[in-house]
From Swiss-Prot:
Official protein name in the record: E3 SUMO-protein ligase pli1
Domain PINIT: 108-261
GO MF annotations in UniProt: SUMO ligase activity; zinc ion binding
Domain of life: Eukaryota
Keyword annotations from UniProtKB, A to Z: Metal-binding, Nucleus, Phosphoprotein, Transferase, Ubl conjugation pathway, Zinc, Zinc-finger
Family indicated by similarity: Belongs to the PIAS family.
Amino acid sequence: MNQANFLQELPNVLKRLETGLIIPQLKDILRVFGLRLSGTKAELITRIKQLIERIAIENNTTSWEALKKAIDGDVTSAVCILKYNTYQIYSAAAPIAPPSSASGNRSYSRPFAPVVHSRIRFRKSPFYDILEQFNAPFVVPACVGTRNTISFSFHVTPPALSKLLNDPKQYRVYLFSTPSETIGFGNCLMEFPTPQMELRINNQVAHANYRRLKGKPGTTNPADITDLVSKYAGPPGNNVVIYYMNSTKSYSVVVCFVKVYTIENLVDQIKSRKAESKEKIIERIKNDNQDADIIATSTDISLKCPLSFSRISLPVRSVFCKHIQCFDASAFLEMNKQTPSWMCPVCASHIQFSDLIIDGFMQHILESTPSNSETITVDPEGNWKLNTFDEPVESSEDEFVPKEKVIELSDGEGISTMANKSNDQPTRRASTHNSGPPAKRKRESLVIDLTISDDDENVATSTTESPSNATKENSLSRNVQSPNIDTAISNRSTNVRHGHPGFKDYTVENSPASRERSTSESAQSSVHMGYAGEGGLLSGALRAPSQQNNNNSNTQHSINLHTIVPSPYEPPLSVTPSTAITNLSIPESNRTNSSASSKSFTMNDLILPPLHLKNTTQTNNAHEDAQSSNLSQNHSLFYERIPQRPSYRIEKQNKGIYEDENEQSISAMPIPRAHPQLPKNLLSQTAGPLWDEQQDAQVDWNSELQSNNSYHNSGFEGTGNTFQSID
C-alpha cells in the first residue's frame, strides 16, 4: 500500500467516519469486516478506528479500498472487493476462542475471515422457491431529501430461460430487495427502499406493490418482472433502473429465478399432512377444564371463517394454537398471498406454513351440521350442540312450491282472481338434513296482470268464470265507478222516472236490435256530456234499458222528459236539442217523432221590440219563424206596451256629419230653434251662445221648464212654450 496516498486519504476518511455516518451505517461497516455490532456510537467509531490501525500496520491495500467503499455507503462493492482477497485480522480486544477438545487442553488462535455475501438468503415463502440468483447484490444507497437513480444489469442463464419459455406459469423472475444491515444475520426480510419508487426493466415500467404494513417488515411481495425480461440469453442482458427518494438506509437488490406454487397446491400439501384427531382434541378440552379453581362454561364456536365470513370448508389452525376456533385454509392462504403477514386471525400469533394442521374435531362438526347453520356450543366435556336460535336460510332442498295466482286489475270489472281451481296441495320435498330445524315456508307469490284492457273484460270473464261467478262480479262492479257505461246501465232499472219539471214524456223502445246499434253511441255521448256518474241531471233518463230480464227484452219503457216553460217576465234562453237524446237507443220508427217533439220546447232568441231594421240573424231551425204566434196573452200585452222610438229624417240642405258614406239619410236629432233673446250674430257660432247674466235673469225659466210634451207611437208633437228665432 502506498503510504503517501494512505496518509493523504486518512483525514477525509476519519472526518466522514466521525461526522457523516449514523449508527446503522457504522454497523454496516463493521458487518462487512465481521466485527462486533453492539455498543454506542462512540464505541462503534472506536472499533472502526482500531480496524484502520491494523490495516495500516499490515499494509493491506485490499482492506483499505473495501473500507473506503463501505464508509462511502457502497457496502456491496466492499463485499465484492473482499470476496477474492482474504486477509487475516487478529483482534486483541475480542479474540475468538477455539472449541474445546476432549483429547487435551490444547489452545490456538484461529484467524478471522471476513463475511463475503455473494448470495442473500431470504425468508422462505410457501408461494415460491428461489432456484437461481442472476446477479450479485446491488446496493441502493440511502438518499434523504433528494431523488436518486441507480441502474444495473443482469443476464438470464440458458437453463432458466428454457424453463421460463416452456412453463411460464410455474417459473417466474422476481426482483428482491432487503436492507443491507440485515445481510449475514439469518434470513432476510423482503422490503423495498421506499414506497415512492419507480422500477423500470428495459425502459418499461414494472407495476408492483412496494408498500408494506406499517411497523411490520417483510409484509410485501417481490416484484414480478417476468413479462419485461428479454427472452434470450447473453449480452447485452437486461437493464434495471430504480428511481427513489427519502430512503433512510441502504438496500441490496437482487434478481432471482423462482418456482411458484398455487393455492391449490398448498391446500393439497396441508391435506397430505397428518390431521389432529377428534379424540385428541376432546381430551385436551377436558384437561384444560379440570382446574378446580376455574369454573368452566360452554363456549360458542362459529362455523364461519373469521377472514372470509363464509362457511369453513377446510378447518385449519397452527399446531401451537390451543383454541377450538379454526379458519379456512384457502382464505388464509389467499390473504397471505396478497400481504404476507402470517398472523393467526384468532389469537394473532405468528404462524408458519409448515405449522398448519387440519382440526379433526371441527371437521367432524362441519360434516354433521347442515350447510345453513352458523354457530355451535361446546361444553367443558367436549360435547357440542347446534344453537337453536339460528334461523336457517331457505334452500332449494327445503321449500314449498306454491302455485302462482294471477290477479287481473281492470277499470270496470274490479278485481278478479284467476287461480288454479284444482284441489292439489303443495307437497314438501324430502330433506337430506335431519339435525337442523325445519325451514320456513315461503310466501305465496301473487302475480298482478295490468295489461288487460276494458275491451277484453267480457271475453276474459266469460271464458274463465261460470254464470254464477259472473253474477257476483256484476254485483261487485256496481260499487266501482267506471267509465264503462254498459255495465252501469245493465245494472240499473229500466223504468226511470225523473221528477224534474223541465222534461217532457217520451217513449223509448227497448229492443235487442236497438241495443246493439246504440251501445257505443250511448257510451260516448254520456261520457262526453258528463253523465257517467249517477249524480248527473240526465244520468237516470239517459241510461239504456237493462239486459237482466230476457223475457221482457221486447217491451217498451217510458222515460219522462218535461218541457221547459219560460216565464213571461224573463227572457228565455235558447236551447238546442241534446245529442244524448238523439243518440239513445231509439228505433228508427220512433226517432222522427222524438225529433219533432224536441222542437216544441226549443226557445227563440231574446225578445226585442221591432226597430224596423233588417234581421241579420240567420235562422237555422224552421220552427223559430212561428214562435211569436205561440206566445201567451200576457206575453202579447207586454210586447204592445213597449214604447217605440220615433223616426226622423234630415233635410237635404243639412248634409254633413248626419249623412253616411252612401249618401242615405238616417235618423238624427231634431234641430233646436233659436232663443228669442239671443242676438243674430251669435247663431252662426258653432261653439253655442254666450251666457249673459242680465239676459238670463229676464228669462222666465219656471214657465220654460213646466212645458208638457206628449208622445205617441205614430210620431212626435210638442205643446207649450215654443222657441222663436230673432229675425
